[in-house]
Amino acid sequence: MSLLGLAAIQTAAEAGGNFDLVEREIRSVAKRFPWVSMVAIGELAIHGSSIDLAEPAGGPTEQRLSQLAKETGLWIIPGSLYESRDGKIFNTTPIIDSAGDIVARYDKLFPFLPYEKNVSSGSDYVVFDAPGGAKVGVVICYDVWFPEIIRTLCALGAEVILVPTMTNTIDRDVELAIARANAAISQCYVVAINVAGEQGVGRSAVYGPGGECIHEAGAGREILALELDMQQVRNARERGWHGLGQVLKSFRDMPVAFPMHESVAARQKAMKNLGALEMPGPIQHDRPPTDAATEPKPKLTIIKKKGPA
């Protein structure tokens, strides 16, 4: 049996520091759920979304997280942190094992442009061996909108995809639909961990390898402690979910190539007519501007109501 005991912690993130709260939540998981071997939290949940709080790799936040991992015996996936390296800032997820070692770093491939305009894109995919024989991949928030990433991670062996997220906008419903679809089309677990409080609307969710919703959280603080069975992933990929579509095999065996994906240049050429990726400006109306002095005034109709006789 290949089980991963995972706790997804939906913290109440504030614009300032949340590290003390995060640490209490992690220590609580270690006491309440002794079968859990890994905890994960939402994107930027520890320090918030200001790049002014970026630290160098191996800085004080990572050091404190490493010590916490050693003390609790848990693998810690601390959402993400803004990290400064080589004169650039990355939105980074350090993967910390139960001995407190950083076994990998994942840099967000798709910063949420144009809003994360000063954050550099990563270049590497990360899949790591986790307790229970699971293979786990990581993406960050907006990355999940690009199914090519999820399928690449699964081609590298991933059976669980962690998606730390910080979303406080109206598109959370869309994000959940995308996460669910990715679970189904790549036949894997998808754990979409949002933050609550000032900087997130919550609604973290876990989907199984058939796209089934295992649990969706509410809007407030919550801990989603689950046993994820890797055999279910392997069965779905081998036999199809409940004996239905064997999606990855079909994708593998299809003899047709995707021209747009042959190179970066081919992709850029295919979508060159979309215009620049920039902040949307004011909404422009079709009605031409007029001079206020000459613009006709709207006709005003007044109806006088007679009083009682």
What are these regions (language model features)?
Residues 127, 195-309:
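C-terminal beta-strand edge segments of enzyme domains
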Residues 57-75, 145-224:
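CN hydrolase (nitrilase-like) catalytic-core segments centered on the catalytic cysteine
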